[in-house]
Amino acid sequence: MPLVAHSKLPTFSDLRNQGHEVLTLDRAVHQDIRELHIGFLNMMPDAALRATERQFIRLVGSCNRIAQFFVYPFSLPALDRSRDTLGYIERYYSDFETLRDTGLDALIITGANVANPKLEDEAFWEPLMDVVDWAWDNVASILCSCLATHAVLKHFHGIDRQPLPKKRWGVYSHRVSATDHPLLRDINTRFDVPHSRYNDISRAQLEAAGLKILAESAEGGVHMAASPDQFRAIYMQGHPEYDANSLLKEYRRELYRYANRERDKLPPLPENYFSGEAERCALAALDAAGQARETGAAYDDTLEADVDGLLDNTWGDTAKAIINNWLGLVYGVTNLDRKQQFMPGVDPDDPLSLKERK
C-alpha cells in the first residue's frame, strides 16, 4: 500500500529518504487501482505536530500494497499555534471544508493538549465535534487516538473520563480481548503499547455504553475498543504510533521542567521502558536534574545520545498490522464514490457483517 506524494508536504520526502515507498503523483495516476483517501486531523501541539504527522503517515504507508493512499493532514483553527506552525499548516495542510466537499474514505484523529478539566470547555470542542459528526455519516471508519478517544466517547456516549491516581506512563503488555474480530486478524495475542495519559475510560464504562473491547492490559487498562457497530469508530487510549524514543523525549522534557522548578516532584521513570544500561543513564540524568535544581545551575543532558541503540521498540510491528487490517476493512466496505459512505449492500449498523457470524 504505497503512499502518494500528492502535495509538497515535507514528510513525504522525509519518508522516501528513509526508505519508505512513496509514489509520485504522476506515477500514481497511471496505476489502474482504487485509491483510498484518508483524512488526518492533527491536533497535537506545535512541538509534536510534525512528529505525530510523520508517525501516523508512516503507519499508513507501511501497509500491504493493495491500494494507493492519499493522506490529507488538516488541523483546527481554534487550536493555539505559533506563527511558524500556522505558516506550515497553511502551506502543507488541507482545510476541512475542502475535504468535506471532496469526500474521504476514512479519518484518523490525534490527541491534543488540554487546559480545562472538562473537555467541552476547550476552544477546539465545537469545531472537533463538527468534524466528528460529519465523519460519522460520511466516512467508513474513524480511528481515534488518546485524547480524541475521550472526546469522541464523551460526544457519542456521554462517557466521562476519570482522572488516574498517577500518570499512566510507560510501555504495557496487552492481550487481545476479541480474537474473532477482523481488525485483530493475525495479530499477536499479546503485544505492547506505549501509554502517556492522566485520565482513563474503563472497561466497565465502555461495556455499559455497548462498545466492544478489543485489547486491554492489567496495568495499562483498555487500549482498543470499537463502536457498537464494531467498525465505524475505533478507539485507542494508547500510542501505538510512537517512535522508540518518544517516551524518552517526554522524560527529558520533564527533567528540564524539574530542574527549572516548573514541576515540584521528581519525574518517575516511564514504566517498563528503560532497562539495563539505559535505566542507569536515565537515573543519572535524574540526579543531574536534581543537582541543577538545588544549585541553580543550567541543566543540560546527553541522555538521548547515551541511550542511543539501547531502547527497544516492542509495539511497532503490531501497530502496523492493526492499521493494515483497518485500512483493508475500509477498502472492503467504502463506496467507489468517496462522497458516499459505504458501497451498496453494506449495513451501517453492521458494516463488517459480524452479526451474520453469530
Regions picked out by a protein language model, each given a short descriptive name:
Residues L104, I109-A178:
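Cysteine-nucleophile active-site neighborhood
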Residues R83-L86, L247-K249:
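Short aromatic-enriched loop/helix-cap "lid" or pocket-rim segments at secondary-structure transitions
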Residues I89-E90, T110-N116, L303-D308:
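Short glycine/proline-rich turn/loop motifs
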Residues M1-S75, L99, G103, W169-V171, ...:
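Amide-donor transfer/coupling interface in amidating biosynthetic enzymes
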Residues A51-R54, G87, L119, A123:
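Generic recognition of short, well-ordered alpha-helical segments
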Residues P77-T85, D192:
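Membrane-interfacial amphipathic helices and adjacent loop/beta segments
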Residues D84-G103:
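Glycine-rich, highly charged phosphate/nucleotide-binding loops
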